[in-house]
Amino acid sequence: MNVTHVTLSPGAKTPVKLASKTGEILVKNFTNGDLLVSIEKEDFEKNYVKIPALMAEVLSECSTHSSTRSYFFDDVYLKSTAGGEVEIRCLKV
């Protein structure tokens, strides 16, 4: 299982390169503030998931799936209101 640990600064958008491409991740927010997570670099402010402090969420790239193929990603963009530790686990490799 591929696991990435990241230390975030408050308010800074941080790009994270995962060890391998995946279609699903588990993001654990160990910070004391909200965590914004996106796989969209350009449209980060429009396309993100908000994970509350000390919570976790499974995220899947389902909007680009078709009946013939799936798209995987290896870039994740994070932004925390409080800064602190975040863990990302690749679930589908």
Regions found by a protein language model. Give the residues of each.
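N-terminal acidic leader/helix
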Residues: 15-26, 30, 34
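Terminal and domain-boundary regions
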Residues: 23, 85-87, 92-93
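Surface-exposed ligand/attachment interfaces on beta-rich extracellular proteins
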Residues: 3-21
